């Protein structure tokens, strides 16, 4: 089954500052919840660009680390970018990051379309943890 998660938040900063922060893959360490033990292995050194491959490890369950390889598939400077999983824990992963300047800051919207592996077991896991 394919799932969709949408989150929107207002960031009280200019679009240039917000975009610069999110367009720097090294900042993923700060954005990711600490319990995931997120670690960039390769590809996070340069500013984000279409076609960029980023390899990292994450820990979804205690003691179980997973390799995750994503590609920055689309970028429109200052407006949006999309990362797609190429290898990793999900059966499918498509993550849109949208930025809309507004008075006093920026509305940022995350739209994640994803599917878990393992069929029924994956769906039970989704019901318990997501």
Regions found by a protein language model. Give the residues of each.
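Hydrophobic ligand-binding cavity/cleft-lining segments
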Residues: 1-49
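Short, surface-exposed coil-to-beta transition loops
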Residues: 4-6, 65-69, 91-95
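A general structural-boundary detector
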Residues: 5-6, 15, 41, 59, ...
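Generic structural detector for well-ordered beta-strands
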Residues: 8-12, 39, 57, 71, ...
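Short acidic, gly/pro-rich beta-turn/loop elements at beta-sheet edges
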Residues: 17, 30, 64-66, 93, ...
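Glycine-rich portal/gate segments that line the openings of hydrophobic small-molecule binding cavities
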Residues: 30, 39-87, 103, 107
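Beta-strand/loop substructures that line and gate deep hydrophobic ligand-binding cavities in soluble
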Residues: 82-130
